Amino acid sequence: LSAAVIILYGLFFAPPSPDPKQVNNNDQNKNNLQLNEAPKIEQNIENNKISRSEAINKVERILFENENIKGSISLEGSLIDDLIFKKYTKTLDSDENVVLLNPKESENGYYIETGWAINNKDIEVPNSNTKWEVIGNKLLTPNTPIKLVWNNEQNITFEKEISIDDKFLFTVNQKITNNTQNTYNFYPYGQIIRNLAPDVTDFYILHEGLLGVFDDNLVEEDYDDIKDKKYSVNANKGWMGITDKYWITSLIPESNKSFRSDFDYKNKFKANFIETDATEVRANESKTNQVKVIIAAKE
């Protein structure tokens, strides 16, 4: 699997040689008091342990489907948290399709979150409980992306356009429009959260757990290892994810953007990244960011 994903990343997502970094513009609004360091990603979500079907029906959703996968995206948090493999069954003699992703409130919660963080506590940013509004199309297919919008009380607009290909790739294009007279620094992030570890095969040539490639270096951490010790790394390119015997869920940050990635366990497993260079959004300005999500079978 690791080799396959490395090849996939190299073919489709490896960034070109980076341009010289722009000199930081220090002429920021003096009223904007905030740190210039990427904040920690903290989403403390309690496990309510309701059934999967209850959790799915509890919130509004956008359905998605292509030749290989189907499921839904929760409008509470814009979480990719319901995914079924259409071509794989739980056993050879079963008609029941494999379910990989589950809502956060179910016992076996397993989901993907993308968004923006900020060091300024006076500015609201979307979180896992934010109620997003759908604009236009309400069915996500390879031919029909969806658009989600949320406005905070400070008059800053957050948008997401989510698309899928005909296999296992989601592309999340995020946009911030600053309708205020101040300048703010935002930090794009993405994280995969899993409440419980799966039954592990414990076969020595097969890695199951958290993994990633950071500046061409492969990192593999078992579920038990992460319970004992957090792993952190800074990188200029790469990807990170969580893998089982047959399946993988992974995130690919935007090309040419430096980031910090953490593998952590605090009552649930997390593989995440946050860009370490702030996205400066000035008054009446818009900025964008892209995160790619691969949720795939190990074919």
Spell out what each predicted region is.
Residues 61, 65-299:
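Soluble non-transmembrane domains of integral membrane proteins
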Residues 2, 11-92, 97-100:
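Juxtamembrane extramembrane loops of integral membrane proteins
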